[in-house]
């Protein structure tokens, strides 16, 4: 299992959330701030199986295409050692 952490600008968060939902991914959104100007950003957390990582990244690429050197999302894919729902 993997945890995908995605950081996007506030203005892109709704579009990406809708795209994840339409593609049967469950996402948790956390409001946060960051960057040089402390602008509003949203951090999204997705827990996915190893086989779903590429599909989740494709959703990001398709929903938020980069324009030139301007990238619209920062992604981290990290292993999950233990997952439990209580």
What does each model-found stretch correspond to?
Residues 1-86:
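Positively charged, small/polar-rich N-terminal and surface patches that mediate targeting and assembly
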